[in-house]
Every structure is written in C-alpha cells, then in structure tokens.
Amino acid sequence: MKFASKKNNQKNSSKNDERYRELDNLVQEGNGSRLGGGSCLGKCAHVFKLIFKEIKDNIFIYILSIIYLSVSVMNTIFAKRTLNKIGNYSFVTSETHNFICMIMFFIVYSLFGNKKGNSKERHRSFNLQFFAISMLDACSVILAFIGLTRTTGNIQSFVLQLSIPINMFFCFLILRYRYHLYNYLGAVIIVVTIALVEMKLSFETQEENSIIFNLVLISSLIPVCFSNMTREIVFKKYKIDILRLNAMVSFFQLFTSCLILPVYTLPFLKQLHLPYNEIWTNIKNGFACLFLGRNTVVENCGLGMAKLCDDCDGAWKTFALFSFFDICDNLITSYIIDKFSTMTYTIVSCIQGPALAIAYYFKFLAGDVVREPRLLDFVTLFGYLFGSIIYRVGNIILERKKMRNEENEDSEGELTNVDSIITQ
C-alpha cells in the first residue's frame, strides 16, 4: 500500500512538473535556433511561444490579476475623490465604511458562508487573530486616509509600489520565504525607479503635495504587510471562511478606529489637525456632510489654509462607490492570500502602480483629480513592467526547482520501497 501511495505521489508530481519540462523544451529549441543561426522572425516566434505557454498555464491567476487591478485602481481613485470632497471628516468616513462592510459581510456570510464552512471552523474562536488583523488594518486605513489627503495622484502610484520590497523583507524574516536572485533584481529595478522619480519630483513645486503626508502614506504599507501575513498564517492552519474573516475584522475595526482617533490631534497634520474639544463637533458635521450634503467649512479654507473646503454635494455617491470597490478589493485580496500566498499577492499588486498613474489621465475615471500625461510616467511604467517581468522569471525558476526536488524525493522513495520488497 505504501508503495502504491508513493507511486501515485510520483504521478502527481510528474503531472505538476510537466509544464516546466515543456518550458525547458521550448528554451532548448530557442537555444538550438540561435546556435543554428535562426532568423530574427524565428527568434521572435520562439519568444511568443514562451509567453503564450506561460499565460496558458497560469490563465486563472492572470484573469484574477486583471480583475484585481481594475478593482484596486478604482478603489484608490474613489478614495482620493472622497477625500477631496469630505477630507475634513476622515474619521467619519472610516467608521461609516467599516459599519457598511460589517453589515454586508455578515449578511452574505449568513446566506452563503455557513454552508461552505466546516464545523471545526464554525465553532472555533479566532477573536485574537481577528483583533490583530483589525488593529493592523485600522492603523493602515487611518494612516492612508491622512496620507492621501496631501499626496498627489502620480506620487500615490509610486509610493504604493514600495509594498513590494516591504513584503519581501518581512515575508523573508517572518514566514521564511526564500527568493531567487531575479526576485531581488526585479524588486531593485522597481525601487530604483521609484527613487529616481521621487528625486525628480522633489525639485518640483507642487502645492497639493507634502513630503510629511507622503511619509505617512508610506508608513501605512507596513501594517498592511503584517495584516496580510497574519491572514496567510491563519489560512494555512485553519480553513476560515473569507466572508467570516472580513465581517469580524470590520466589526473589530469599529472599535480599533476609535483607539486611533487621538492621532488626529497631532499638530503636524495641519489641515487635518483636530483639537480634542472639536472632535464631537467634527463628527456631527461629518455626518451632516456625508448624508445631508451640508457644507460647514466654506470660509477661510482651501489650499494652503488651515482647513480644506467642504464639497458635500453628492459626496454620498462618491463614498458609496469607494465602499463598493473597497469591499471587492478586500474580498479579492483575501482570496489571493487564501488560495495562493502573500508572495503571489505581492506579485499581483505590483502592477497597480503604472495602471493607476495612467488612470489619472482620464477624466471619466479620475473626475476632479485628473492629471496631465507626463513623459516621466511612461518611464516609470517601463521600469515597473520590466522589474515585474524579472521578478516573475525568478518565481518560475523557484517553482521549477521545487517541483524537481519533489520528483527526485519521490523517485528515491520509490526505489527504496522496491528494494525493501525485493529483499523481503
């Protein structure tokens, strides 16, 4: 029986490794054509074969990446548009959004989640893990909302790409991920591109942009990284329903956001600075702005002033769209981490930067935060895409090496069992 089990494992391993052997054959064909002095057209055809093979074997993850890319870009755009309308009331928008997420996730989970979850998962308490994730997410949301208020659209796309090296570092440190040289090279290409862009932008005068708020936005990436790693650890140990996880996290965030409310009293926040004695008034004005469309801050406000001007007319529509795309973003992110890994999510998320920069060119997408196209954006787009391709090549090499090691181990185990049977 043990011999048969080993034989089945070998068959499964060989089946999983088949696509890598086909890739090897394509590479060898390409090397042969180069040695034989193949034409330029033949070399191009060989490259397209490799690309087609990669896409065909990973069609699901590429479709999922396109869906995630679309949702993530729209989520970021509507977050910025919401802040431009009601940027004085970030706490109100954050709490309202958490409440909407909690209600929606609990309704859907009560209808569909219980049928999918097993009895062990339903009866086990994960409150500590849910609370940890909610604390990390709450820190990230508050910091991101503050940072986005004075961070221009183009710089947003650059800053968000820093999640790649941050995720790589902490996954290596905590989850014991191992990377290929090409993974590091791809990440370095992206980071260097970001550094050059930031250096260039630092010499430009941009009234809407603040280096302090840029740093706040960058700091919001660290709790996101730890939150994703916590999700992966829980998913690997227990089969937790994605809807239940997001519902409970949203519930805890209603309270964890209150713990971070004193952050708004920090004086360096300038336009977002909120003294303790004005907190309750700000909350009331925020609800009036969001649900009644009533402007409160209309005088002595604006760019460079102590306060942002309210633009509450139709704010609830923009906020509703932001909530919808953010809910979808959370679900897709959890699904990717559940079915794949934090590393896969990092690879997928790296494509949102250039897409976001280009999305800000179109008024029907960006609305009042539309930007003029710049050559610098296309330079960074090339850097992002080139770095992402190099990163993916490193991942393919690691996957191929892992498959071969498993196949060799199964082969050795089969030979050992055969020898023992013959000896007996």
UniProtKB/Swiss-Prot annotation:
Keywords recorded for this protein, A-Z: Amino-acid transport, Disulfide bond, Ion transport, Iron, Iron transport, Membrane, Transmembrane, Transmembrane helix, Transport, Vacuole
Residues in the Vacuolar compartment per record: 84-89, 148-152, 203-210, 264-279, 293-314, 362-374
Domain of life: Eukaryota
Function: Nutrient transporter. Substrate transport is pH-dependent. Can transport arginine, lysine, histidine and peptides. Involved in maintaining the osmotic homeostasis of the digestive vacuole. Required for the normal asexual intraerythrocytic proliferation of parasites. Can transport Fe(2+) and Fe(3+).
Xref: PANTHER family: PROTEIN CLT2, CHLOROPLASTIC
Miscellaneous comment as given in the Swiss-Prot or TrEMBL entry: Can function as a drug transporter. Can transport chloroquine and verapamil. Active transport of chloroquine and arginine requires a membrane potential and a directed pH gradient: 5.5->7.5, corresponding to the digestive vacuole pH gradient of the parasite. Binding with chloroquine and piperaquine is inhibited by verapamil, amodiaquine and excess arginine. Can transport lumefantrine or mefloquine.
Protein's name according to its UniProt entry: Chloroquine resistance transporter
Naturally occurring in which organism (per UniProt): Plasmodium falciparum (isolate 7G8)
